[in-house]
Curated annotation (Swiss-Prot):
One of its GO terms (molecular function) is structural constituent of ribosome. Keywords: Ribonucleoprotein, Ribosomal protein, RNA-binding, rRNA-binding. One of its GO terms (cellular component) is cytosolic large ribosomal subunit. InterPro entries: Ribosomal_uL14 (IPR000218), Ribosomal_uL14_bac-type (IPR005745), Ribosomal_uL14_CS (IPR019972), Ribosomal_uL14_sf (IPR036853). Binds to 23S rRNA. Forms part of two intersubunit bridges in the 70S ribosome. The gene is rplN. It comes from Shewanella loihica (strain ATCC BAA-1088 / PV-4). HAMAP family: Ribosomal_uL14. NCBIfam families: rplN_bact (TIGR01067). Belongs to the universal ribosomal protein uL14 family. GO terms for biological process: translation. This is Large ribosomal subunit protein uL14. The lineage of its organism: Bacteria, Pseudomonadati, Pseudomonadota, Gammaproteobacteria, Alteromonadales. Coiled coil: none annotated. Part of the 50S ribosomal subunit. Forms a cluster with proteins L3 and L19. In the 70S ribosome, L14 and L19 interact and together make contacts with the 16S rRNA in bridges B5 and B8.
Length: 122
């Protein structure tokens, strides 16, 4: 469950390390984002020679949350940390590698690229 001011780690090699949610996209008064939702983020910490610089604003898709996601069979998949993958204006990933597992809920037309790059799909 991600809301405004939430900090997330970045699960791709775009150059950003930590980002902060500045808006949950998808509705005028939408408060929370879960796995698979697109948010607007600001880069708070970045590595020296990466594509993303501190202060840059990007779209991002949430790939892991502490809250987790409930499956139809009743099981819940939770993670230790909140994480997102940075996206460009066309909602394509900026990085070329994805770190850590992602969930099956990302297997939509939009985010198949992220699923194919991920080392593990839960």
């Amino acid at each position: 469950m991600i809301q405004m001011q939430s900090t997330l780690e970045v699960a791709c090699n775009s150059g950003a390390r930590r980002v902060q949610c500045i808006k949950v996209l998808g509705g005028s008064h939408r408060r929370y984002a879960g796995i698979g939702d697109v948010i607007k983020v600001s880069v708070k910490e970045a590595i020296p020679r990466g594509k993303a610089k501190k202060g840059d604003v990007y779209n991002a898709v949430v790939v892991r949350t502490k809250k987790g996601v409930r499956r139809p069979d009743g099981s819940v998949i939770r993670f230790d940390r909140n994480a997102a993958v940075l996206l460009n204006a066309n909602l394509a990933p900026i990085g070329t590698r994805i770190f850590g597992p992602v969930t099956r809920e990302l297997r939509t037309e939009q985010f198949m690229k992220i699923v194919s790059l991920a080392p593990e799909v839960l």
